[in-house]
């Protein structure tokens, strides 16, 4: 078999096209929607969390703006009525809104997965986005 030059993508930052009529603010959970565009995290079924927005961006039409998103582990607000705790370390936590996570997905509409709980630090949830 011949050698193949398989390129490596370096780093933990990606750029994604933003959904139509959408503003994503720096520091929000950033997600890919069912159409393949970036939106802010919300209590919506089927979102795929990809990291934290590194800039504030507004798109008028789908894809006319792009947003830089960073993967890694970030401290997010813990929903007081459905708290993530140390027993949840290693488990998924769920998106409640663009900067808050919760322990379960049982509300209607159900929550999308935010990422994996790494720790609880100062009452906030350390969430790993892959």
Regions found by a protein language model. Name each.
Residues 1-130:
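Surface-exposed, low-hydrophobicity beta-strand/loop segments enriched in small/polar/acidic residues
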């Amino acid at each position: 078999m011949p050698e193949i030059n398989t390129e490596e993508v370096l780093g933990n930052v990606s750029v994604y096209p933003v959904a139509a009529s959408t503003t994503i603010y720096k520091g929000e959970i950033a997600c890919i929607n069912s159409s393949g565009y970036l939106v802010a995290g919300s209590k919506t079924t089927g979102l795929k969390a990809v990291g934290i927005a590194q800039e504030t961006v507004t798109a008028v039409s789908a894809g006319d703006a792009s947003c830089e998103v960073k993967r890694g582990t970030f401290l997010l607000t813990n929903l007081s009525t459905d708290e993530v705790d140390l027993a949840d370390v290693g488990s998924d936590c769920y998106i409640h809104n663009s900067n808050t996570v919760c322990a379960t997905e049982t509300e209607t509409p159900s929550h999308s997965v935010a990422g994996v709980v790494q720790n609880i630090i100062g009452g906030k949830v350390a969430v790993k986005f892959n």
